Amino acid sequence: MNLAKRRNSILSLPEYSLRSSESNKFTASDDELDNLRFGFFGEIGSLLSSVKRSIRDQVTESQSELASEELGDALWYLFGVARTLGIAPDSLGEACISTLRTRANEIAKLPAAPITFANIDGVLDSRHGQWDITRTQQLGSIANAAGMLAATAKEQLKAMALPAATTYLGRIFSEWALACSAFELRTEDVARENLAKIADRWPAKLSFHPLFDPESIYEEHERFPREFSIEFIERQSSNYPYVVQRLRQVNIGDRLTDNSNEPDGYRFHDIFHLAYVAYLGWSPVLRGLLKLKRKSNPVIDENQDGARAMIIEEGIATWIFNHAKDRDFYDGIKPGKLDFSLLKQIRSMVDGYEVGSCPLWQWELAILSGFEVFRELIRNKGGTVTVNMIDHTLKFIAPTDQRK
């Protein structure tokens, strides 16, 4: 994971608080404060676990790269706690800077509002190498601070006078900043990277990636139909069920079975390729099956529509299927709740391919919608699925009869 590059604009604490709050799903809940403070504790625990695994398993990512995401997630929860307690972002930043300057035996001089992450980095840089802490010591300090926050009764936190609560959270914020410094991370980079993750996973507004086969570039014979229907027909052989698929009354592809000793419905797995088309505008497998390869562009034809891309897509579909099989095929999982590590792994698998530019929330919609229709196909032993690439939908219609 590449660390976020610094921008020309400076990220202020009020801006971070506003943008990060857009993904807060705990708002107006009676347990909001508990969820946020326990979330902070959990992310610090994940930070410690990531560092431990990096040493034990000799992972290729550096400890700083691993720490950056965990510290970013912890920051999100910490600012959520501050908002819940009515602490303004600038006040939180001032308390953090005052704590750092006092610890460095400096005059607690405060910058003008709005407080920025660059202000905090400036304080850390002014004493670079002089904080007299090791990475291990600082992990212990922030773990202790997170534990104390989790152990303090919710009622006690809410009963604190605002100045006392601000000072208290400011101290925790300073421990977070020192943890960033211990991992040679700039707080502004960590905060920006966290905002990028939020936009990738939980955007305030959904805006789909443009289609990969626009009419302005490709002729009709090289474009997916913007709307089409595939009929899935389950039939029974002497030993096992199999599925055939039809497009406009014409069979396409080979008959599919579960290819497993234990029946699991894999015979309907082509629904996932349809979901990728509907929500991502991508499926090298279906391009090949429907003879829609973009041969007018030899580079695209070779690298994006070729055999390797097809193998990767089939590998993703199979890997996700195996992950879902142990989780009721994602029944009941809502958008925004799918395993984030799963989505990150998919991102790494499609790195270098056109679909790699699609945000993770699009992948999540494709996966969850695909499995929603998959469960209907299993339940109804087939059906018709309509793909709409403009509205980004999959629609299922149950079969009117049971074909044998």
Task: Put a short name on every predicted segment.
Residues 1-404:
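Flexible "arm" and connector segments at domain edges
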